[in-house]
């Protein structure tokens, strides 16, 4: 812990309090200070000008990052018949229905993403208390309940991120790894920001993208100058 403390102090010494950093400089700083023994994720937090207490201002969506997330995504699919075969051909790790539900109930939940066809929701709906707290419950608003299960599997495997505003109106997600080139991270960030712009609630007033902060898994946040965003 002492080594980590010294590292964080060293990182903070490189940052100017209150400064908004151009996105490229912020990403270069994150890559420069990423020296822990494992490959860190590059994470983004976006403060949105919404009131998440109002149901029509909850922002929820998904984005396929053009350069992926830099990790293997395990996908489980609840479906049957021709959809089951299509899901397997698309690369799903586990496909099933009642049998997969029993696996989940037993505590074996080795998935990053769970997808379901609409006809499977009669089974998946019973798993809400297990999947919901883990952020794995399929939802049509983010494309994980769909008739095109093969397409959803392909997107998930390609590095699709899903997000929803928290109680403070903030979106959190990863945009890649510190090993990525800066241009690749910028392209991923651009895709996310563009999609967030399309999801602006009609009832939201004032500034929509209020603040954007970049960080690594073990590092402090760096506030980004939005004028430098690659959009």
Curated annotation (Swiss-Prot):
SUPFAM superfamilies reported for this sequence: Ribosomal protein L1
Biological-process GO terms, alphabetical: regulation of translation; translation
Keyword Chloroplast: no
Keyword RNA-binding: yes
Highest taxon, organism lineage: Bacteria
This protein's UniProt keywords: Repressor, Ribonucleoprotein, Ribosomal protein, RNA-binding, rRNA-binding, Translation regulation, tRNA-binding
PROSITE patterns per record: RIBOSOMAL_L1
A GO CC annotation given for this chain: cytosolic large ribosomal subunit
Gene Ontology MF: a single term: tRNA binding
One Pfam family from the record: Ribosomal_L1
Protein family per UniProt: Belongs to the universal ribosomal protein uL1 family.
Function as written in the Swiss-Prot or TrEMBL entry: Binds directly to 23S rRNA. The L1 stalk is quite mobile in the ribosome, and is involved in E site tRNA release.
HAMAP family: Ribosomal_uL1_B
PANTHER family referenced in this protein's UniProt entry, alphabetically: 54S RIBOSOMAL PROTEIN L1, MITOCHONDRIAL, LARGE RIBOSOMAL SUBUNIT PROTEIN UL1M
Complex and partners: Part of the 50S ribosomal subunit.
Protein name: Large ribosomal subunit protein uL1
Gene assigned in the entry: rplA
């Amino acid at each position: 812990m002492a080594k980590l403390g010294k590292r964080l102090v060293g990182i903070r010494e490189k940052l100017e309090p209150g400064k908004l950093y151009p996105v490229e400089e912020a990403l270069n700083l994150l890559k420069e200070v990423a020296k822990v023994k494992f490959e860190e994720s590059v994470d983004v937090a976006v403060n949105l000008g919404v009131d998440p207490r109002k149901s029509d201002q909850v922002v929820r969506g998904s984005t396929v990052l053009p350069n992926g997330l830099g990790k293997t995504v395990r996908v489980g699919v609840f479906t049957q018949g021709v959809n089951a075969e299509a899901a397997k051909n698309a690369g799903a790790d586990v496909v099933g229905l009642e049998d997969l539900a029993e696996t989940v109930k037993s505590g074996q939940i080795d998935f990053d993403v769970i997808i379901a066809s609409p006809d499977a929701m009669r089974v998946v709906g019973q798993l809400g208390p297990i999947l919901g707290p883990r952020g794995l419950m399929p939802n049509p608003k983010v494309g994980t309940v769909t008739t095109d299960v093969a397409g959803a599997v392909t997107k998930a495997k390609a590095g699709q991120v899903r997000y929803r505003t928290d109680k403070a109106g903030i979106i959190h997600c990863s945009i890649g790894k510190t090993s990525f080139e800066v241009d690749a991270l910028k392209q991923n960030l651009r895709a996310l920001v563009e999609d967030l712009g399309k999801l602006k609630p009609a009832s939201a007033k004032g500034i929509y993208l209020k603040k954007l902060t970049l960080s690594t898994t073990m590092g402090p946040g760096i506030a980004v100058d939005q004028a430098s965003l690659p959009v």
